From Swiss-Prot:
Entry's Gene Ontology BP terms: adipose tissue development; liver development; response to cadmium ion; response to corticosterone; response to estradiol; response to ethanol; response to growth hormone; response to hormone
Presequence positions on this chain: 1-46
GO CC entries: intracellular membrane-bounded organelle; matrix side of mitochondrial inner membrane; mitochondrial inner membrane; mitochondrial matrix
Description of activity control: Requires phosphatidylcholine as an allosteric activator for enzymatic activity.
Pfam families: adh_short
Subunit structure and binding partners: Homotetramer.
Protein's recorded name: D-beta-hydroxybutyrate dehydrogenase, mitochondrial
CDD domains for this protein: type2_17beta_HSD-like_SDR_c
Residue sites binding NAD(+) per the record: 59-83
EC number: 1.1.1.30
Subcellular location per the Swiss-Prot or TrEMBL entry: Mitochondrion inner membrane; Mitochondrion matrix
Residue numbers of N6-succinyllysine PTMs: 103, 259
Signal peptide range in chain numbering: none
Length: 343
C-alpha cells in the first residue's frame, strides 16, 4: 500500500493547500502539502513519562534567570535533586537569592561560569560530593546557559562572534565533556537547549545562529556516540521567547546599537548609511517585543526529555508560524524559502 502510494505521481496524491504569510511584510504564498510527508495537524504528546524523578540528580546551567531559573524550580517540584548553576551566585544575584530562599536540600545553587574551565571542574566536584552514591552517577545535564546578540555580518565585530560562541557553543561542549563520566555511570540524559535558529538561519542573527547550528551538530554526534552506552541526548529548539526571557530590554537594544555603530569601520558606515542601520535596529526592537511570554512549553519539553523512557531526539516548543517556517526552510529547496522569506 505504502509502496504503491509512493510510486504514484505527485499530482495524483491528495494534497492540502496552505497559505503562508510572512509576518515581516504581510506577503502571502500558497503551498501545497501532501499528507504522506507532512501533517500540520499532528501534535506530539508528552504522555510517555515513565522514569521516576525522585532523588535523581540534575544539573541545569544558566539558572540566574529565564528558562534556567524556571527549570530549576520546576524540576525541584517534580522531585529531582537540582544543582542550579548560576553565573552570578558570587555576586548575590536576585535569581540566586530566590532559589536559595526555598531552603531545600534538593535545590542547591552553585557558582558556574560555563566559559571558565576551573569553575566547571569545581562544579563537577560539588555535584559528585552531593550525590548519595557517586559511583551510580548523575542522571541529567541541561545545557541552558546562553547569550544572544544581533547585527548584520558587517555590523558585528569579531569579538562579538567569539563571545557568543564561547558561551553558547564551547560552554556547552566544555560542560558536557566534564560531566559525561557521571552521566555515563547513571545511563542518564543530556538535554541541550538550542533554538529554532539552530535549524534555520535569520538575517542579523549570524553570531547566534552559528553557535546554535553548532550545538545541533554537537548534540547529534554525541547522541550517536552515547547510544551504545545508554545515555540519551535530546535537543530542545525553542521559538521566539525573547519577551519571556528578558534577553533584550529597549535600553539594552539601544546600548548595543550605539556601541555597534560607534565601532563600525568608516567605509561600512558610509556605504550603508545611518538610515539603513536605524531601520534594522527598529526591526529588531519589534521582534524583541513579540513572542510568547509563557515558557511552559519549553519547561515541559525539558521535563519530558529527562523523564520519558523514550525521549524525543528534538523538541520544537514554538508557535505555529515559526514551526511552519522552520519546516519550509529545512525541507523545501532554498529557492522556495528564499522567495518567501528574503526581502
Amino acid at each position: 500500500m505504502l509502496a504503491a502510494r509512493l510510486s504514484r505521481p505527485l499530482s495524483q496524491l491528495p494534497g492540502k493547500a496552505l497559505s503562508v504569510c510572512d509576518r515581516e511584510n504581510g506577503t502571502r504564498h500558497t503551498l501545497l502539502f501532501y499528507p504522506a510527508s507532512f501533517s500540520p495537524d499532528t501534535r506530539r504528546t508528552y504522555t510517555s513519562q515513565a522514569d521516576a524523578a525522585s532523588g535523581k540528580a540534575v544539573l541545569v546551567t544558566g539558572c540566574d534567570s529565564g528558562f534556567g531559573f524556571s527549570l530549576a524550580k520546576h524540576l525541584h517540584s517534580k522531585g529531582f535533586l537540582v544543582f542550579a548553576g548560576c553565573l552570578l551566585k558570587d555576586k548575590g544575584d536576585a535569581g540566586v537569592r530566590e532559589l536559595d530562599s526555598l531552603k531545600s536540600d534538593r535545590l542547591r545553587t552553585i557558582q558556574l561560569n560555563v566559559c571558565n574551565s576551573e569553575e566547571v571542574e569545581k562544579a563537577v566536584e560539588t555535584v559528585r560530593s552531593g550525590l548519595k552514591d557517586p559511583e551510580k552517577g548523575m542522571w541529567g545535564l541541561v545545557n541552558n546557559a546562553g547569550i544572544s546578540t544581533f547585527g548584520e555580518v558587517e555590523f558585528t565585530s569579531m569579538e562579538t562572534y567569539k563571545e557568543v560562541a564561547e558561551v553558547n557553543l564551547w560552554g556547552t561542549v566544555r560542560t558536557t565533556k566534564s560531566f559525561l563520566p557521571l552521566l555515563r555511570r547513571a545511563k542518564g540524559r543530556v538535554v541541550n537547549i538550542s533554538s529554532m535558529l539552530g535549524r534555520m538561519a535569520n538575517p542579523a542573527r549570524s553570531p547566534y545562529c552559528i553557535t546554535k547550528f553548532g550545538v545541533e551538530a554537537f548534540s547529534d554526534c554525541l547522541r550517536y556516540e552515547m547510544h551504545p552506552l545508554g545515555v540519551k541526548v535530546s535537543v530542545v529548539e525553542p521559538g521566539n521567547f525573547i519577551a519571556a526571557t528578558s534577553l533584550y530590554s529597549p535600553e539594552r537594544i539601544q546600548a548595543i546599537a550605539k556601541k555597534m555603530w560607534d565601532e563600525l569601520p568608516e567605509v561600512v558606515r558610509k556605504d550603508y548609511g545611518k538610515k539603513y542601520f536605524d531601520e534594522k535596529i527598529a526591526k529588531m526592537e519589534t521582534y524583541c517585543n513579540s513572542g510568547s511570554t509563557d515558557t511552559s512549553s519549553v519547561i515541559n519539553a525539558v521535563t519530558h526529555a529527562l523523564t520519558a523512557a523514550t525521549p524525543y531526539t528534538r523538541y520544537h516548543p514554538m508557535d505555529y508560524y515559526w514551526w511552519l517556517r522552520m519546516q519550509v526552510m529545512t525541507h523545501f529547496p532554498g529557492a522556495i524559502s528564499d522567495k518567501i522569506y528574503i526581502h
